[in-house]
Structure formats: C-alpha cells, structure tokens
Amino acid sequence: MRQKETTATTRFSLLPGSITRFFLLLIIVLLVTMGVMVQSAVNAWLKDKSYQIVDITHAIQKRVDNWRYVTWQIYDNIAATTSPSSGEGLQETRLKQDVYYLEKPRRKTEALIFGSHDNSTLEMTQRMSTYLDTLWGAENVPWSMYYLNGQDNSLVLISTLPLKDLTSGFKESTVSDIVDSRRAEMLQQANALDERESFSNMRRLAWQNGHYFTLRTTFNQPGHLATVVAFDLPINDLIPPGMPLGSNH
C-alpha cells in the first residue's frame, strides 16, 4: 500500500513539469512560425517596393527622353521658325515692370515674358505656347517651360498654371521667386562651357503639393549668349499612391 502511494505521488509531481515543457516547446514553435511568416511578409514587401522603384525609374527615364526630344524640337524648329504674318494680331499686357503677359485665346497654357524684348520674341513665345497647348492638352498636373533667350536675354515662362492670376494675386512673390531662381540657374549653366545638360534635385510646388525636377539644356550660339531651355517635369503622376515623397522646395 505504501509503495502504491509513493508511485502515485511521484507521477503527480512530474506532471506539472511535463506540462510546462510542453507549453515552452509550443511557444517556441509558434515564435519560429511567426518569425518565418514575418520574414516572408517583409521579403514580399521589399520585393514589391523594388519593383515599384524600377517602374518609377523607367517612367522617369522615359519622361526625360521624351522632353529631351521636345527641347530640341522647340529650339531647332519652333523657336527658330519665322513667318511674315505670324506676328499679326499679337498683343501683350504689361503686368508690372519688365513682366509681360501674352494675350491669346484661353487654351491650355499661359505665357509671360520677363525683360525687354522685341516683336520677334513675342512671336516666338506665341509659337511655343501654341505647340505646348497641344502637348499638354490632356495633362492634369502642372507643367512649365522656361526659355532663356540668348538673343535679347529675356526669359519666357510658359505654363499650365494660371500665370496672369498668380502674378497679379497673393502668390506674386512666389512666382517671382521661382522665376528668379530659374534665371540664376540657367545663367549659371549658360556660362558653364562644359555643361550641356543638367538636372535639379527634386522640388515641390507648395500650393499644388506637386513634386517635380528641372531638366536644363544649353544651346550655344556664335556671337550671342547661350540659349537655355528648362522644363519642370512633374513626377506625382508617376508615383504609386501611398508612397511618401520628400518635402524639398
């Protein structure tokens, strides 16, 4: 009888330890399983993000190639074209000192000319604006082009933004700051003999929450200052929803 009691006592004393070891093993298995699942999820997320980055890179490169071609088209064909009757009926409005607005039927773009210029620059601005009306007709994000004219050192700004309203309204200083900044960049590049093409860092148009970068191209002209053509190329439409962007200005 005493031996049976001793055996039963030993069995019950070992039972709690067995349960503890079982649960410890179960917890370890669960942790390992969760770790594998988390690692698999992280790897899938990283793979998806890497594919997105590759797609964005290809899209940006395609955009650069397209607008590099447009830059040459504008300089070689649009800006250089002359027509005896192209300037008939053209009008410009002086918004303030050395800032002129090209009057044209309201289409996709508006144009400003900064600095003294002659009628040939006005005609050239009208041709470039009409050309960009076609290219930007279906676009919903802001696009802008700057043309630093080596012939008279004027600066032409053509944009899908409402330039006349912005220049006359409370954002006047912002537009002036952007134009002054672009002119300084373009003049610097025009004087850099070894730099034909350059890119800016990513920028942000604050009131539109639009991110973009600037493509600048220099064209040297014997006997004149260099002409520089710059495009602000938006990237918001190339970025997947939910992907954060920097806050550069």
Residue positions per predicted region:
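Non-catalytic regulatory/interaction regions at protein termini and inter-domain linkers
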Residues: 1-13
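Well-ordered, non-membrane alpha-helical segments in soluble/globular domains
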Residues: 118-132, 183-184
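Solvent-exposed, extracytoplasmic
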Residues: 125-139, 222-249
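Extracytoplasmic/periplasmic ligand-binding sensor regions of membrane-associated signaling proteins
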Residues: 138-231
